Amino acid sequence: MKKHIYALWAFFILFSQSIAASVEVRSTHMTTGDGVANNSIRYIYQDSKGFIWMGTLNGLSRYDGNSFVTYRPEGGNKISLIDHRIRDLEEDKNGFLWIATSAELFSCYDLKKDCFVDFTGCGEYEQLYSYKMTDREGNVWLWQDGNGCRKVTYMNGEFTSVVFKKENNNLPSNNITYISEDEQGRIWIGSHDGIAQVVGNKAVLVEENHDAFKMMSFGKDVFFLSGTGTISLKREGEDSRIVTRLGEGSKVYSTMRLQNDWIVFTEDGSYVFNLRTHQVSRDTELNIARGQVQIDNRGNFWIYNHTGKVWYVNAKTRFVKSFQLIPADKVNYIDEERYHIVHDSRDIVWISTYGNGLFAYDLATDELQHFESNINGFSHITSNFLQYIMEDRAGGIWVSSEYTGISRLSVLNEGAERVFPEDETLSDRSNTVRMINRMPDDKIWLGTRRGGLYIYDPHLKTIESSRYFDSNIYAVEEGADGSI
């Protein structure tokens, strides 16, 4: 009985619909015809209740697994979605969904009461802000280069906010480039004109004439990096001081931290600044000019620089692997590289590209698979110009595209491998398995529809011998004397 079950399972593995060597999926597609607000979906998010939210170019859609609800700006005095062009979504710890739009305006949606709310507490929710940061206490900081910033607090069921602006005499400059929190919980505001530390409801200038690019916290020390590679150090009770300059005023593109090393990517390559010793060296393995850094959902780094090549860096082990995801002849036609990366619950890394489809990298097998849209037949993605990717809590992979809707991929063959005795490109059912049997020596004998008899090692990895017969083999048995 066990042998028959084994044979049926092998037959299922071999003849399920395949899209790649080791990842087999089923896909469903949704467009405006199914209720999505717009076919160009720029962001996907699953909230704490399980709803899937889709930010599109013409409204916000909420999907419950069966139907859609669409939100768009409304007239009148009722608070509604502030703009129809959505670019980012995130839920905070109080159950509010923060919605960033292309108009540099934010909306805030109460997921418990199903309504939009005034997050400022004073009717100023139409102020321009481009970026958002949430501190460890749950306060939301909004800012824009030119309009200062706002600290939003939700407490006892009410929103209150504090505006930091030069005109209010509580901010040295309105031209904010970042707001960051250090390991001690202190808030730092970087601008094109210097660095300020938030003390109460006022930002106090700690360094002038510093075109702020990034802050890095190391214990009680705080380092500030300028847009031209100057690194300053601020210690408790001491004035800020310059500790080094990277190159000759090279333009900084991005940074990442690996243990005690702060890696800075500039126009002439990368530099390594050791946060403990303050020593600077050149990075030989990651000497990537104009490198841009993305961090995936596991905290690992992905670097790209408009060459179509992407470098993966494991944040804990520092392991580096590169992938050529977009050919050189294609990347020149793409003005802005757009990659989104999700490391899923199966240890498969999914990478969406803008212009060359979808990739899946299996960490266990070190195999990279490529999924493309095919206008001449069925495809699991509907465009090669992808805009976002997300894994839901059931393990489904959501892939959105530009102008062609969204796909949900379900992985079918978790823990299974496909075995092709014959050439896997054959379409004449030559790989139909007629017989499979484990012999007393643990070797596996397998017969195919073409009369082929294959002898595999005990793990079905290696063919040790093969021969063909004039008819199909349906059974095999070894006698007491060892004869077959």
Regions found by a protein language model. Give the residues of each.
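Carboxylate-rich, polar loop motifs that coordinate divalent cations or form catalytic acidic clusters
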Residues: 1-484
